[in-house]
Each structure stands twice: as structure tokens, then as C-alpha cells.
Amino acid sequence: IEVPQAPKPPRKPAPNAPQSELDKYNAQLAAHQKAVEAWNRDMKPEADKKTAEFNAAMAKALEPLSPQALRDNRIDAVIFCNTSGALPLPDLEGFANWVKSGGAFIGMHAGSDTLKDSLPFTDMLCGTFDGHGPQVPATLHAGDKEHPANGNIGDIWALSQEEMYLIKNQKRDQVRSVWFMRHHPNKPEEKGFFPVAWVRGLGEGRVFYTTLGHREDLWSTDPALKGRINPVETSNQFRNHLLGGIRWALGLAPGSAEPNPTTN
């Protein structure tokens, strides 16, 4: 989630700086003060809204994901954002137990292409990456349009272009479908149930996963983004989808985790 940042003040010149540097600093300071006024008026409310409920940090190593570190640092949720492969977590079974004891796990896109041969992880996620074809337009159907992870999008979500995953090993009686497809766009001749996003309760914990998130124009709301195919409206819908799922996983938004295996 991109949070607007407050303007930074100019660096003060040295005490013995020449008058030209002092004049430049004073001009920059005046411009900064105007920028702060504009920030407080136009941007600060949005920034406060986005940071009021939770803080986020990026882990550059795996040690912070040990169960003990998660407890010691009072971490409420872990996000696998486009991770892939056999991540050497310090204690994978302990990590799954941390979720069961009240933690939250959130996976995005290639998060299901992670630890595919590790039973504690695949059992926790309840769905495994099984390949994808070329990027295509896709029509998504809501499994639960009242759930926060629906993003207030409604019954149908039309994507102009995305890399749509195939998912295997999902026990539908253990998850609540949030978004799914009735036809996979890479295999339009096949009718069925193709998971896109789901949630589940796991012991005292919660899991939210979405297969979406490959294209940059889903993440970015920059209308001038090079190569944009999805409109900015879709980018905002994607953000609402993610933020709704994160808030639900953290217990900040109500929503059911009751499995809905007959949804089609």
C-alpha cells in the first residue's frame, strides 16, 4: 500500500556558509512551508487513514519469521507477496502453528508457488499453484460479495489483462471462496470452478490469499504507467481487494470464514 509521505525540509547550511547558500536555503524553506500547508490540507488525511490501523515493515531476511521472533516482536500478520520457491523458513511447522494460535497469513499471487512441497504450508494455504498461460482478460465472480476482500466490487469483476493461475489441491470444504472463475480464460472450453481468492479460519488464526497481482498496472494507480492495459479503476479495485483481505485477516473488518463449497 503506497502511503503519501510528508515533505522533507531542506538541509540547513553550515554556520559559515556564504550568503548565496543562505539565500538558497531561505527560498527552499519558504517553498517547504507552502508544501507542508498543502500536505496538511490535501494529503495528510489520506496518509492518516492508511496508517491508523496497522503498521507494515519489509523483512529482508527470514530470521524475523521464526515463531519466537514473531511472538517477541508482537507481529500480527505475515505477508508473502510474490514469493516463490522453497523459502528456508527457520521453523516451517512452527510458523504454521503460529498462525493456528492466532496469527494471520496473507499470500499474494506467487505466494501459492512457494513451499509447494512443504505439507505444513500447503495445508495452511489450502491451494497450490498449478501453472498459468499467457496473460488474458478475465471475468471473476464473487463467492461472497459482502466479504471485505470483495473490495466492494460487487458480483462481477472484469480484468482487462492478468496472469491467471490454475490452482490445485484445494479442499473447498475448508475455504470460503471470495472470487472465482466459471471458465478459465486460457481454457475457455472447460467449464468448472477456478479459484481466484479465498479466506479460511485456521484454529484461532486467519488466512487470506489472492492469485492476482502479476501486472504492474494492477498495483500502480499511475495513469501514465508505460504499458498500462488495466484502467486505473481496476487498480483501485485491486487495492481495495487487498486491503479488505488484510483488514479481515487482522481482525479489523468483519467477514465470514465459513466454507462455501457449493458456490459456483
Predicted segments with their positions:
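Glycine-rich, charge-decorated loop segments at or immediately adjacent to ligand/cofactor-binding or catalytic sites
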Residues: D113-L125
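Non-transmembrane alpha-helical segments in soluble domains
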Residues: A96, T122, N150, L243-R247
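Sec/Tat-exported extracytoplasmic proteins
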Residues: I79-N82, G103, I153, A249-A253
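Catalytic beta-strand/loop cores that center a nucleophilic Ser/Cys/Thr
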Residues: Q33, E37-K50, F54-E63, G127-T211
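Helical hinge/lid and interdomain linker segments adjacent to catalytic or ligand-binding clefts
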Residues: I1-G107, G111-T114
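Residues at alpha-helix caps and immediate loop-helix transition turns in enzyme cores, especially N-
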Residues: P90-D91, D117, G192-F194
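Extracellular ligand-binding/catalytic regions of CAZymes and related secreted enzymes
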Residues: K8-A38, D42-F54, P185-F194, G201-N264
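Solvent-exposed loop/turn segments at secondary-structure junctions
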Residues: T83-L87, F105, G111-L115, D155-W157, ...
